């Protein structure tokens, strides 16, 4: 299947503005959209849209949204780019967590809470700034609040659910709208020796009956996108146990205030925000 990438680079503010426009416009299409810092000194960021087969149609839509001629297009070899990119990924440290691929087991140090996640079909290896920030808040929250159960909403690779389980042997529900992600999540939980603590389910939002069996939750973590987080604010609050904590990520710096306001409207209190590589992770109670 032919794969193409539409890409555009600009300063941080313009790149974030463009990313936000495209992320909202293509939310229902399923096209992966990424924003990456490519020049740290000059603060230049690149926005990419990955498409299959219909690159010309998508390019026309992009031109209509952000202006003609801004994005270039390149054809990509027909390979699994996420898996292929693992070769260039370095292990990530977030608090005491050490997230690594199978090729970096030799880099685990004494005292590390090691989580092995190979890049593949599900998003979330720990190499993304928003995931790293979330891991830091998870460590702090679990160690200070001692939750008795947890929910990882939009689990992806299950890196966050695994992190919770490595800190506390509590029941954890890990859900995702993508059945492939749910399969990968279960495999990763088993690989990391915490499968007995993590129950996985394919679910969109909170509509699945499994939530009735597990809620309310002392800890809810959700590393998805800003717009779904805002829409889900009432449901997330509804499924939170009294005195519980919520950790949100998948949020750009520029989206922080809107997401925070949605949860403060639900009566939640802002505890902390971590900023990592242009992304934020938010802790509320």
Swiss-Prot record:
Q: Matching PANTHER family, A to Z? A: ELECTRON TRANSFER FLAVOPROTEIN BETA SUBUNIT LYSINE METHYLTRANSFERASE
Chemical reaction(s) catalysed: L-lysyl-[protein] + 3 S-adenosyl-L-methionine = N(6),N(6),N(6)-trimethyl-L-lysyl-[protein] + 3 S-adenosyl-L-homocysteine + 3 H(+)
* One GO biological process term: methylation
UniProt binding sites for S-adenosyl-L-methionine: 131, 154, 176, 223
Broad class of enzyme this protein falls into = transferase
CDD domains linked to this entry: AdoMet_MTases
Record Pfam families: PrmA
The record's Gene Ontology cellular component field reads: cytoplasm
Give the chief site where it resides. Answer: cytoplasm
Source species, domain of life: Bacteria
Q: What is this protein called?
A: Ribosomal protein L11 methyltransferase
Which terms are listed as keywords in the entry?
Cytoplasm, Methyltransferase, S-adenosyl-L-methionine, Transferase
Q: Which InterPro entries match?
A: Ribosomal_L11_MeTrfase_PrmA (IPR050078), Ribosomal_PrmA_MeTrfase (IPR004498), SAM-dependent_MTases_sf (IPR029063)
Membrane-spanning segments: none
Q: Where in the cell is it found?
A: Cytoplasm
Q: Which cysteines are joined by disulfide bonds?
A: none
Q: Which family does it belong to?
A: Belongs to the methyltransferase superfamily. PrmA family.
Instruction: Give GO MF terms, alphabetically.
Output: protein-lysine N-methyltransferase activity
- NCBIfam families tied to this protein: PRK00517.2-1
Functional note: Methylates ribosomal protein L11.
Does this entry carry the keyword Aminoacyl-tRNA synthetase? Answer: no
The reply on keyword Zinc-finger is no
- What are its E.C. numbers? 2.1.1.-
């Amino acid at each position: 299947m032919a794969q193409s990438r539409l890409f555009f680079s600009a300063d941080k503010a313009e790149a974030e503005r463009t990313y936000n426009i495209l992320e909202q416009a293509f939310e229902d299409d399923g096209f992966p959209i990424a924003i990456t810092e490519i020049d740290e000194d000059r603060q230049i960021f690149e926005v990419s849209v990955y498409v299959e087969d219909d690159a010309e149609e998508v390019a026309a839509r992009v031109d209509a949204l952000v202006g003609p001629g801004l994005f270039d297009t390149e054809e990509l070899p027909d390979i699994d780019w996420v898996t292929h990119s693992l070769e260039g990924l370095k292990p990530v440290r977030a608090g005491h967590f050490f997230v690594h691929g199978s090729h970096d087991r030799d880099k685990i140090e004494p005292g590390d809470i090691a989580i092995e996640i190979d890049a593949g079909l599900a998003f979330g290896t720990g190499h993304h700034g928003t995931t790293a920030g979330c891991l830091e808040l998870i460590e702090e929250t679990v160690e200070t609040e001692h939750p008795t159960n947890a929910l990882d909403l939009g689990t992806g690779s299950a890196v966050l659910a695994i992190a919770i389980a490595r800190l506390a042997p509590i029941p954890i529900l890990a859900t995702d709208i993508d059945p492939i992600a749910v399969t990968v999540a279960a495999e990763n939980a088993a690989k990391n020796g915490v499968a007995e603590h993590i129950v996985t389910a394919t679910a969109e939002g909170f509509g699945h009956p499994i939530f009735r069996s597990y809620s309310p939750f002392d800890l809810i973590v959700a590393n998805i996108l800003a717009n779904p987080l805002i829409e889900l604010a009432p449901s997330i609050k509804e499924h939170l146990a009294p005195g519980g904590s919520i950790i949100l990520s998948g949020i750009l710096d520029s989206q922080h205030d809107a997401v925070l306001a949605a949860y403060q409207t639900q009566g939640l209190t802002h505890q902390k925000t971590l900023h990592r590589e242009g992304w934020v992770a938010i802790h509320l109670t």
